[in-house]
Amino acid sequence: MVNVRFYRNYGKTFKKPRRPYEKERLDAELKLVGEYGLRCKRELWRVQYTLSRIRNAARELLTLDEKNPRRIFEGEALLRRMNRYGLLDETQNKLDYVLALTVENFLERRLQTIVFKSGMAKSIHHARVLIRQRHIRVGRQLVNIPSFMVRVESQKHVDFSLTSPFGGGRPGRVKRRNERAGAKKASGGDGDEDDEE
């Protein structure tokens, strides 16, 4: 019997560009990486790969006849998914709108961007740090993945986690130290040299 220790997913999640040194592409990628606070180009390529697969699916469905049951069923499912993630409006219920989607539409729906746009973080990079340090929750679920795609109905539930000092949970390290020092002085004991500094 084969002992399987690790299950590996061999599916590709991103695709490298064919030509590595294209000035226009490099400049455009750098602008997006800076604007949306991505860690590396691979994060951008991952979004581009997802978008290309969705557009290919839409293109394939558009080749079928309008009355084709497969086109109706799969097309509606694809549009429903795009609406759920806020990539398309409720009014945009045609497959042609899927072909018009851009990388920016996807990057706008990332948790990192939404945390920054909602004013919870000082910058896009600060938003990433808050998410990685487990300060952000979506509904009841604590999420520490900056690339988490936020659904439309979940967007109003993005908030600081219950244990986070930012959300009024457990006080932070400095605040706890100051509270201890204040309690010592109130009880009459003179504070340590550390508290004087």
Swiss-Prot record:
One of its GO terms (biological process) is translation. The gene is RPS9C. Transmembrane segments: none annotated. SMART domains: Ribosomal_S4, S4. Pfam families: Ribosomal_S4 (PF00163), S4 (PF01479). The keyword Metal-binding does not apply. This is Small ribosomal subunit protein uS4y. Keywords: Ribonucleoprotein, Ribosomal protein, RNA-binding, rRNA-binding. Binds to the translation initiation factors TIF3E1. Residues 161-197 are annotated as: Disordered. Belongs to the universal ribosomal protein uS4 family. GO terms for cellular component: plasmodesma; plastid; small ribosomal subunit. GO terms for molecular function: mRNA binding; rRNA binding; structural constituent of ribosome. Residues 109-183 form the S4 RNA-binding domain. Gene3D superfamilies: RNA-binding S4 domain. The lineage of its organism: Eukaryota, Viridiplantae, Streptophyta, Embryophyta, Tracheophyta.
